[in-house]
C-alpha cells in the first residue's frame, strides 16, 4: 500500500498561535524525504489549519503527488484549477465539526457533482470522493465521473480503539466488500480517517491487495511531536509496507 501523509495538524499547531511555525511545508518536505508516496492536505473553507499559501508552496516544492482535500464549493474549485494538485478529494464539511465526521453523500449530490467535476477532470486532475463503504455511494461515484474513492475508515478505527475487535473485524469485511465492488466498477480505491500506529496493522493485513493507499495524518503528527517527523513517517511506512 502507498502512504499519503496528511500535514493538516502541523498547521493546527501553528495556527494555535497564528505564527509561522511549525511549517506544514517543511513537514511535507521531510515526509517526502522519509519515503512518503503522497502529501495530503485539507484546505477548509474556514482556513482553520492549512492556508492557501501552504497549498501553493507544497505544490511548487514537492515532487511526489499532492492530494487536495476540499469541499465541493465554487471557491475551492477555482483554487484547484489554479494550483492544479495531482488529485482532489471531495469531502463534506461542517464548520462545527472537529474533523471530517463521515463520507460525502454522493447519491444526494449526484446531479450537482456531474457538472461540478467537469472542468476539474478536463484540467487533468484526478478526482477522488471520500465516501462510506456503501454500494449506492460507489455507484453514484461512478455516475458523476470519479476516478477513485477514499473509503471512510473512522468506524473501524473507533471500534478497534475501544477494543471491540470482533465488530472491528466485521467493519473490515464491509470495507473489503466495498473495495472489491468499487474495483469491479473501474475505480481506484483508497482509505483513511482515524488510522493509527496501533490499528493500522490489522487493516493492512485484511485489506492489502484491495486498498491501494492510506491517507494518515493526526497519528503521524502526534508521534512526530515526540520522536520527530522523519522517524514518525518511516515507522508508519514500515507498518503498511511490510
From Swiss-Prot:
Q: Does the keyword Transferase apply?
A: yes
Q: Which GO terms describe its biological process?
A: pyridoxine biosynthetic process
Any idea which UniProt keywords this protein has?
A: Cytoplasm, Pyridoxine biosynthesis, Transferase
From which domain of life does this come? Answer: Bacteria
Q: What is this protein called?
A: Pyridoxine 5'-phosphate synthase
| Residues annotated for 3-amino-2-oxopropyl phosphate binding in this entry | 6, 17, 194, 217-218
Q: What InterPro entries does this protein's entry cite?
A: Aldolase_TIM, PyrdxlP_synth_PdxJ, Pyridoxine-5'_phos_synth
- The residues listed in the UniProt record as binding 1-deoxy-D-xylulose 5-phosphate, with positions renumbered to this chain, are 8-9, 44, 49, 99
Which residues are the active-site ones? 42 (proton acceptor), 69 (proton acceptor), 193 (proton donor)
Instruction: Give the Gene3D superfamilies listed for this entry.
Output: Aldolase class I
Q: What does this protein do?
A: Catalyzes the complicated ring closure reaction between the two acyclic compounds 1-deoxy-D-xylulose-5-phosphate (DXP) and 3-amino-2-oxopropyl phosphate (1-amino-acetone-3-phosphate or AAP) to form pyridoxine 5'-phosphate (PNP) and inorganic phosphate.
Q: Which GO terms describe its cellular component?
A: cytosol
Q: What is its EC number?
A: 2.6.99.2
Site, Transition state stabilizer: residue positions:
150
* Metabolic or biological pathway: Cofactor biosynthesis; pyridoxine 5'-phosphate biosynthesis; pyridoxine 5'-phosphate from D-erythrose 4-phosphate: step 5/5
Q: How does it assemble?
A: Homooctamer; tetramer of dimers.
Catalysed reaction(s) here are: 3-amino-2-oxopropyl phosphate + 1-deoxy-D-xylulose 5-phosphate = pyridoxine 5'-phosphate + phosphate + 2 H2O + H(+)
Family to which the UniProt record says this protein belongs = Belongs to the PNP synthase family.
The record's subcellular location field reads: Cytoplasm
Ranked from the top, the taxonomy reads:
Bacteria, Pseudomonadati, Aquificota, Aquificia, Aquificales
Q: Name one GO molecular function term.
A: pyridoxine 5'-phosphate synthase activity
Amino acid at each position: 500500500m502507498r502512504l499519503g501523509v496528511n500535514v493538516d495538524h502541523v498547521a493546527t499547531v501553528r495556527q494555535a498561535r497564528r505564527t509561522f511555525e511549525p511549517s506544514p511545508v517543511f513537514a511535507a518536505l521531510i515526509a517526502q524525504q522519509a519515503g512518503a508516496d503522497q502529501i495530503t492536505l485539507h484546505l477548509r473553507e474556514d482556513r482553520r489549519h492549512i492556508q492557501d499559501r501552504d497549498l501553493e508552496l507544497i505544490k511548487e516544492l514537492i515532487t511526489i503527488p499532492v492530494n487536495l482535500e476540499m469541499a465541493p464549493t465554487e471557491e475551492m474549485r477555482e483554487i484547484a484549477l489554479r494550483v492544479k494538485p495531482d488529485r482532489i478529494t471531495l469531502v463534506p464539511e461542517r464548520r462545527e465539526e472537529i474533523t471530517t465526521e463521515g463520507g460525502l453523500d454522493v447519491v444526494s449530490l449526484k446531479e450537482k457533482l456531474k457538472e461540478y467535476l467537469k472542468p476539474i477532470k478536463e484540467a487533468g486532475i484526478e478526482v477522488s470522493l471520500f465516501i462510506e463503504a456503501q454500494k449506492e455511494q460507489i455507484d453514484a461515484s461512478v455516475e458523476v465521473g470519479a476516478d477513485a474513492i477514499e473509503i471512510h475508515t473512522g468506524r473501524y478505527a473507533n471500534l478497534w480503539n475501544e477494543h471491540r475487535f470482533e465488530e472491528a473485524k466485521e467493519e473490515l469485511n464491509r470495507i473489503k466488500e466495498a473495495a472489491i465492488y468499487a474495483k469491479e466498477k473501474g475505480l481506484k480505491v483508497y482509505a483513511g480517517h482515524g488510522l493509527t500506529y496501533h490499528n493500522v496493522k490489522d487493516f493492512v493485513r485484511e485489506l492489502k491487495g484491495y486498498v491501494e493507499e492510506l491517507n494518515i495524518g493526526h497519528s503521524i503528527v502526534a508521534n512526530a511531536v515526540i520522536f520527530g517527523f522523519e522517524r514518525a513517517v518511516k515507522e508508519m511506512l514500515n507498518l503498511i509496507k511490510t
